[in-house]
Structure formats: structure tokens, C-alpha cells
Amino acid sequence: MDEPTKRIPEFFGCMVFNEDKMRQRLSADAYEAWQQCMTHGTPLPRSIADQIAAAMKDWATELGATHYTHWFQPMTGVTAEKHDSFITPSGNDSVIMELSGKELSRGEADASSFPSGGLRATFEARGYTAWDPTSYAFVKDKTLYIPTVFCSYSGQTLDKKTPLLRSISRLDQQCLRILRLFGNTEAHHVIPQVGPEQEYFLIDKSMYQRREDLKLCGRTLFGARPPKGQELDDHYYGAIKPRVAIFMQELDEELWKLGVFAKTEHNEVAPAQHELAPVYTDANTATDHNQLTMALLKKVADRHDLVCLLHEKPFAGVNGSGKHDNWSLATDTGENLLKPGKTPSQNAQFLLFLAAFIKGVDEYQDILRCCVSYPGNDLRLGGSEAPPAVISIFLGDELTAVLDSIIQGTAYVDMTKKKLEIGVDTLPEIPQDTTDRNRTSPLAFTGNKFEFRMLGSSQSIASPNTVLNTIMADELGQFADILEQAQDFKSALQTLLHDTFKAHQRIIFNGNGYDDSWAEEARRRGLSNHRDTVDSMPAYIDPKNISLFTRHDVFSEVEMRARYGIHLENYCKITAIEANTLLSMIRRNIFPAVSRYTSDLARAVQRKKALYLDCSAETDLLQQLTNLNNELYTTAQSMAQALENAPASEGGLASARYYRDVVYALEYKASHLVNELEANTSAEYWPYPTYADILFSV
């Protein structure tokens, strides 16, 4: 083992103020108080907060930190921070380095400058950040980062972390009720475990700088299909190029220093596409870590003259990027509640948790679809590269057979675990999993967890996990209400499983989600099919969903309606930015470039005619390009008029529909016209790098 490899355990988490560092630097009383705060939510006395703050500051300054920031996750989907130095005047024009318990525990931010959905007006600017002691502070770029929640002056949530923490707490409470019914008195907490698989593209910075659409929108707004894409399937799991490997190595080291469990990396399907997957951890930490991962992907790429694209669909014609959210439940004693065991038909506890998940997904499929809706994800979902827009659950043959036997009241004989015959004697036998890998399913059971595959690559994982946690808490609470009152627990459990699986079996689909027939089958089953963000957003204000989140105190009705408004406004603004960017590129570069080329073609035709030479090829091309350029000009004019006539982005559903049906429709038409022009215009005239230039630049 070489020296750098030996050092990994030593420097892992070296920039994190974790439990070990607290144990070393805090008094026994302060450490115990922090532990009680972590496990039981006990408030920290001011004196203890002061001691923790002082220890945290001393540790951070030893690492070179000069500032601290309350790091929070507003409704923008990315993190926010305001940096304050540790300096405090001490008289005689001198300073000391200090961080008080008050500064650690609470900060202030201008809430009116972040998306609030009407919860904050410009003249109601005050918002507060409050320390989340369940997330470790860390040092990055000579700044102490303190994870916090963000709320308004009146206490309404303005971030993504607060609802997540609330949902984790509610789920914990309901899981313990179920475990007690099965005689488990050892577990004191149940924590959702999450492992997000992060996909991304890496392109050369010089190519990025020459495309306004990439710089302003994060994706290309046009691009003719390159001669080679992903047809040969040669990029997926292919050898990692040296330049990318060096980037990945540095990224791993940066993440490991911050305590992020970066584990697996490989090439993805599309050219220039890659994936990074971490080891599972609790949902709150996983959410923080994924935000750090996305930030460091961009930062480290920049050091290597690369650009990391996190957009869901940066290039048409090749696979887009998603983020598979692997979700499970674990007790503080180490038991995975979604692990079937060797005989799932007899594992009643597992079946009850499975029933709760199936029931919850069926009843709240609209809000699950809604929580992954985003303009970028609209370009990916429903194509033959990502799950369809219809929510369904894949269980695999064995579990489906178990459910069928419960529904029909027949005995079930467990399948003997088969062996996959490899056919090569030198290889060991590999046990065949009881579930295949159905890549077309939005929610797939993969042995001991559910894989939610609809998330977009740029999306925070906070909202989807908040929804999963709340749905599960609600269903488990209903089950506990029934079983706690049962005279005969075993009989009541059997009836509950039978009734639940029978009532909600429509949500289970083990087939090919890419097949066109699935949409019709889903309609026949009564499943919802919201094709885009605009159609799915009303789920936020559906009385059923408002009732779900308010009865568990995850959101208030006002907070739900605010998020509905924020997402619709965001849709309008993103669509407007893309349309304006494309309009600028067409008017300033594409139309003039094609005009120059056609002018030169026209002169070539005249010269050939003067020499009585055949110029039919040039004439045909000239006519084709002239027609396309004229149509592009007309479409651009219509797009400009549509933008001028557009309603205010704060206009709710009506405004979002206008941007989708009018503005985006014209953008889509213009994009395809540009693609045709690119494919037929001489390379020396074309003003932008092509897909072939960009995708194969690294």
C-alpha cells in the first residue's frame, strides 16, 4: 500500500468538527449536553453553546479559518452563505478571534431576497438562520461552515432542510410504534438512510466559453446530432480517460476531507457523462453531503480547465443526467427494516413496512411526481433514457408472488435462491438476486431499499426525501392505530396486509416502463400521468396533500401554497431565460452566419452559371438554407413577440401554461430549425462548437 493510500483514514473528515473532535475539545458536561441535544432534541443552555462555539472556533482557526458562515438551503435549490469574520474589537485598535454561542446558534439574513412565495415582502426582509446541531460544521476555503435552517421573522420555513428534519422526526415516531408492536424494545430511533447517485457531464472549458447557452442556461439550446453518440454503448463503464481520472482523484480527496463517503465512480452511457455514488448515510447528512458534492464537482472541474454540467439534459440526442435516490430505514441498533431476510413470506415486520410504502406511493403518487418536477427534468422524464412520468413500483417476481399469495389467501413456497451459472470454472458461483434491475421503473425495490429514480441531477434531494418520509410516517401511523387496538394481533396483521395489498396492487408494475403500451395500461389502472412541471404542480395545493403535510406539522398550508407559487414562478423565469438566450444567439450569430454562407453560395452559383457549369447541387442547398433561414427569422420574431406579451412570472398556473404552450413551443421550433441549419452549413461559417466538438473534447 503506497503512502497516499495509507493516509486516507488519517485525513478522512479532517475538515469536519465531528463527534471525535467534540469529545476531545469539550468538557464532559458540554459533550453530554450536545449528545442529549442530538438524540433527544434537548435545548442547549447558553453556557454550553458558548463552550461549543469557542471550541469550534479554536479548531477552525487552527485550520486557517478566518470567517464563519451560516450555511443554509433556501428554496433556490442550492446553498446560500454570508461570511462574517471571527474578529472582535478588544480595545487599543486590536482584535481577538471570537465566536459566541449566540453567533453560533442564530444569524440573520434578508429573507425577501430569496424565493418565498409571498411569505416575505421587500419591506419584510428579516429572516433567521438557526444552527442544526445534528449536522456537523466543517471548514472549507478558510471559512467555518455551520449548517443551519432558515425561517422568516414569523417562523415560516423558507428552506428545504427544516421540512426534511421535521419529516425525519415524524417518521421516527411512527416507526417505533410499529417496532414496539413486534416486541422490539431495544431500538430507540429509526433513521431514513439515503444514498444519492450523482450523474454529471464533464466538458472542456474552452468549449463551454464559446456557448452562451451553456453559460446562461446550463444546457445547449440547439445542436445537430453528431456522427457518433452513444450508439456503440462503449462509454458506459469504459476506461476512464487520464484527464478525467485526475479530476476524480482530486474530487475524492476533497470530499473525503469533508467527511463525504465518496465511493463509486464510473463513465455513464452518454459521451462525457459520469457518475459518483457515496456510501449510504442518514438523510439529513446525505442531503448536506450531496450539496457539497455538487459544489465541489464544479469547483474541482474548474481547476482542471473543465466544466461540470449538472443540468438534467445538457445535450439533446444522448442520455440526460439523473440522481437515483436510494432510500431505506435503519434502527439505531443497525437493523435495516426494508431487508426481507431469507424467507420474506414469513417476515411479517418487513411485509408491514412494505405494505405501508406501497399504500403511500399509490395514495400520494401525484405529490411524488410533483416533488421531482423541474424544467430541466421535463426534458428527461418519459424518454427512453429515464423513468416514465407515471409513478409505479417494481418489486420483482418473488415479492410480487408473495403479495399475490397474501391477496389470494393461498400458501406460498419460498423460491429457492438460484445460482447464476457463469460457465467459467475459475469464477465462483454468484447468487442471483431475488429482484432484477428494472431500469425503467421510477421506484424500484432493489433487495433492501427503494431506488427513487426520477430525481433530476441538479435537484436537491431534500424535497423528495421529505415526501417519502412523510408518506411513510402517515401510513405507519394508520397501521399502528389499527394494530394497537387489535384483540388478536396476528389475525389483525394478516387482514391488514391482505386488504392493503389488494387495494393498492395497481401501483405495482414489473414490466417495461419505456413501452408505449404502459401509458395506456396506467390509464386503465387509474394511475396519474402528469407529463411536465406545469401539469404536476397543482398537487402542492391539493387538499389531500395539504392535509397530509399539515397533520404531521411538516408544512403549514401557507408554506405549501408558497412552494406552489415558487415553483411555478421558477418555471416561467427559466423558460424566459432560455428563450431570450436562444433569441440572442439566433439574431447575433446564427442568422448572420447562415446569411454570409448563402451569400457566398449565391456568388458561387453565379460564377458557375457564367462558365456554363452544372450548379444544381449549390442551387438546391442555397434554396434549402434560404428557406430555413427565413423560417428561423420569422420564428424568432414570433418568439420575441411572445416574450413581450408574456404575463408576469408571478401569475401562477396561467402564466406557467403560457410559457409552456407559447414561449417554449416557439423555442422548441426554433431549436429544430437551427439544428437543420447547422447540419447543412459549412463548418467555417458556423459560429458555435458542435456536439461532436463538445462531447469529445476531454
Language-model-detected regions and their locations in the chain:
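Active-site-proximal loop/turn and secondary-structure-junction residues that shape catalytic pockets
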Residues: 48-52, 72-74, 102-103, 150, ...
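C-terminal amphipathic alpha-helical interaction region
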Residues: 497-698
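Short linear, low-complexity motifs centered on an aromatic residue
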Residues: 77-93, 112, 211, 218-220, ...
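Hydrophobic/aromatic-rich, well-ordered segments within soluble, folded domains that form packed cores
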Residues: 65, 69-73, 289-303, 329, ...
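Histidine/acidic residue-rich metal-binding segments in metalloenzymes
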Residues: 4-7, 11-101, 106-121
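Histidine-centered active-site/metal-ligand motif
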Residues: 47, 67-70, 266-268, 324-326
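Glycine-rich, acidic/polar active-site loops that bind/position phosphate-bearing ligands
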Residues: 124-310, 319-322, 329-565
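Flexible inter-domain linker/hinge segments
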Residues: 1, 6-20, 169, 173, ...
